[in-house]
Amino acid sequence: MLGVVATLRVKPGIEGQFEAVAKELVAKVNATEPGCRLYALHRAETAGTYVFMERYVDQAAVDAHRATDHFKTLGRKMGEYMDGRPDVVRLREVE
């Protein structure tokens, strides 16, 4: 299993707009990507900071996720609300 933890900072005052788009992405990923075992958005204690937690069965599932229309379209839309680039950590499960 592979994991991804992506921390995003959102511009002040538009958190609700960001959350609406992000929740749409979460719903589409969970409904259509069988290789993705976890795709969840969390609000951090720090204002305007969000964390996506992701878990995939293999690299092919990660690649498939990144190639979807919903990831490309909604990811670009979320980018409009972000304050800088996301901090992404890629993980490999210890078996």
Region roles according to the model:
Residues L2, A40-G48, L74-E95:
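Glycine-rich beta-strand-turn "strand-cap" elements at beta-sheet edges
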Residues G3-L8:
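Active-site-flanking beta-strand signature of metal-NTP-handling nucleotidyl enzymes
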Residues V10-Q17:
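Short, surface-exposed ligand-recognition loops at beta-strand->loop->(often short) alpha-helix junctions
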Residues G13, A47, D69, T73:
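Short alpha-helical
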Residues E19-V21:
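A short, well-structured alpha-helix characteristic of acyl/acetyltransferase catalytic modules
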Residues E24, K28-C36, R55-V89:
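An amphipathic, aromatic/His-enriched active-site/gating alpha helix that lines ligand/cofactor pockets
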Residues T46-T49, D58-A60:
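Short, charged/polar surface micro-motifs in flexible loops or helix N-caps
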